[in-house]
Amino acid sequence: FGGIEGVMRGKGELLDYLQTHGGTAFYSSESEYLAQMIGKRKGLQAVPYSTAGMTAAEKGNYLTVRKGATEIRTHLVGDYNIGNVAAAIAVGGHFGVPEQQIVAAIESYEPDNNRSQRKAGARNTLIMDAYNANPSSMRAALANFAKEPSEQPKAVVLGDMGELGKYAEAEHAGIVELLQQLGIGEVYLVGKLFSEAGRGIYPAFADAAALNEYLQEHPIHGRLILVKGSRTMKLESVAERL
């Protein structure tokens, strides 16, 4: 999309399509940008949702969400996923699905596409979030990972975030600064942008293949590892090595 403006333009195209074809937009009312975009499209059917009145907690390895007297035990990792739970509740409610069935559906969902997916392997435990990455999702994932209790030492593998346009260098530098603030000591950076941002601070690799070569010579064992980056970085190949 070439930057934030491109992302908003793309969302606008989706809203225009829904408006033209009589569709319904479900959107977070906590997003000022989306609320403004919805407001400008008169006649568009729109259903807002929010996390107001919802609380999130990590119980065991996964996210548990409470809304009033209702508790939802998900198979998702990270309290930042509370917004996704709110969206699912809104969609189900709009189409008249009983609350009990909505809860059961959310609780039965187990990610298998490298999105908030926890994998316990023979060598390490992985939190795979390598399908997509942007500055806000990466900051949220890192902050959640840093505070997660773990008997295993922690490590992070981060791949470049794509489609940031003129903001790319600054956003990657900001993530490196956040890593230092969070005190996550074992970090592996993958991609041109992170290599530049983390030069002299963390080990950096041109691509996933280069990191895999390093890991073959320097295997990692007994870690809890967050793996996050844009899909184009192909970090799932690193997960196989870990």
Please report, for each region that a protein language model flagged, where it lies by residue.
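ATP-dependent carboxylate/acyl-activation modules
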Residues: 113-117, 232, 236-240
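Short, well-ordered alpha-helical microsegments
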Residues: 34-35, 212, 235-236
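Short SAM/SAH-binding signature in class I
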Residues: 87, 220-228
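Conserved strand-to-helix beginnings and helix N-cap segments that scaffold or border functional pockets
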Residues: 1-4, 85, 138-139, 168-173, ...
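Acidic, Mg2+-coordinating active-site environments of NTP-dependent enzymes
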Residues: 1-125, 151, 177-180, 185-186, ...
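Active-site beta-alpha connecting loops in nucleotide-dependent enzymes
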Residues: 111-114, 130-203, 230
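Short acidic-hydrophobic, aromatic-tinged amphipathic segments that line or gate anion-handling sites
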Residues: 49, 202-214
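Hydrophobic "anchor" residues on beta-strands that sit immediately upstream
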Residues: 24, 125-128, 155-156, 224
